A protein has these predicted regions:
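Terminal amphipathic alpha-helical/low-complexity segments used for targeting or macromolecular assembly
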Residues: 1-65
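Flexible, glycine/small-residue-enriched loop-and-beta-strand segment within the central core
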Residues: 74-84, 89-148
Length: 148
């Protein structure tokens, strides 16, 4: 992990406020620019499932299992704080704000137009541009025994 990445993710893992214009805020905007570039490639046409896996791996900075499937369009304003298990399906028009962390477990299906947000703007009008990380979001599959 790059030094700036570590600095950012250590900071947000402590749920400290990200002040507008701060070094952490600037890093976050750099992640967003990178994510926009990669999601344009993910969303740009007829990628094979393997190509989508490779692009999503590049977006997250982690190896994504070949069983991963995604129907574009897909949006994120970070990408580097998403982890994905096996047999994950993300349907179209989802938007993940993953700066605070998003862990998607095995066998998870995510429906159309799902928004997952891990940051929130402060309510104070004078500090509205500041944000607070809300911690890691966990998406899990609940396996049930349907045998009678």
């Amino acid at each position: 992990m790059k030094e700036n990445d570590k600095k950012f993710f250590d900071y947000v893992s402590e749920r400290k406020t990200i002040c507008a214009g701060s070094e952490i805020h600037v890093l976050m905007h750099g992640f967003a620019a990178r994510a926009q570039k990669l999601t344009r490639k993910i969303n740009a046409g007829n990628n094979s499932p393997l190509k989508t896996v490779k692009l999503f791996s590049k977006l997250t900075g982690r190896k994504v299992d070949s069983s991963f499937r995604l129907f574009p369009p897909f949006y994120t304003d970070c990408g580097k704080n998403i982890t994905v298990g096996k047999n994950v399906f993300i349907n179209s028009a989802c938007c993940f704000q993953d700066q605070g962390g998003l862990e998607i477990g095995d066998n998870v299906l995510i429906g159309h137009q799902v928004v997952i947000a891990t940051l929130n703007h402060l309510a104070d009008p004078l500090r509205r541009a500041d944000m607070t990380p809300k911690g890691k979001c966990l998406c899990r599959s609940f396996e049930r025994d349907f045998k009678s």
